[in-house]
Amino acid sequence: MVSLSHYLVLGALLFAIGVVGIFLNRKNVIILLMSIELMLLAVNMNFVAFSHFLQDTAGQIFVFFILTVAAAEAAIGLAILVALFRNLRTINVDDLDELKG
């Protein structure tokens, strides 16, 4: 049987992979967005694990709201990224400082 600690360890590992992805690759915006989404999904998995362990559906309902916001965030982020790529022909974070006023 899979216990709560197994889910929490897996969530912590996924969160750590997301943090490492942010710190190791600060050049590519797509990798940054994917790392942030991985961290958010790790937190969601912990919400669902605690919700199941405590026999409460509030955590699972909260996850649906978080996933909705995350989907909107990803869509807006990718739309901004496409617009920047069309103008600058690059998605490097270092090259995006041209946007400063």
From Swiss-Prot:
It catalyses: a quinone + NADH + 5 H(+)(in) = a quinol + NAD(+) + 4 H(+)(out). Pfam families: Oxidored_q2. Its EC number is 7.1.1.-. It is found in: Cell inner membrane. Keywords: Cell inner membrane, Cell membrane, Membrane, NAD, Quinone, Translocase, Transmembrane, Transmembrane helix, Transport, Ubiquinone. It comes from the Bacteria. InterPro entries: NADH_UbQ_OxRdtase_chain4L/K, NUOK/Mnh_C1-like. The chain crosses the membrane at residues 4-24, 30-50, 61-81. One of its GO terms (molecular function) is quinone binding. Its main location: membrane. It is a multi-pass membrane protein. GO terms for biological process: ATP synthesis coupled electron transport. The keyword Protease does not apply. One of its GO terms (cellular component) is plasma membrane. NDH-1 shuttles electrons from NADH, via FMN and iron-sulfur (Fe-S) centers, to quinones in the respiratory chain. The immediate electron acceptor for the enzyme in this species is believed to be ubiquinone. Couples the redox reaction to proton translocation (for every two electrons transferred, four hydrogen ions are translocated across the cytoplasmic membrane), and thus conserves the redox energy in a proton gradient. NDH-1 is composed of 14 different subunits. Subunits NuoA, H, J, K, L, M, N constitute the membrane sector of the complex. Belongs to the complex I subunit 4L family. PANTHER family: NADH DEHYDROGENASE SUBUNIT 4L-RELATED (PTHR11434:SF21), NADH-UBIQUINONE OXIDOREDUCTASE SUBUNIT ND4L (PTHR11434). This is NADH-quinone oxidoreductase subunit K. It comes from Nitrosomonas europaea (strain ATCC 19718 / CIP 103999 / KCTC 2705 / NBRC 14298). The gene is nuoK.
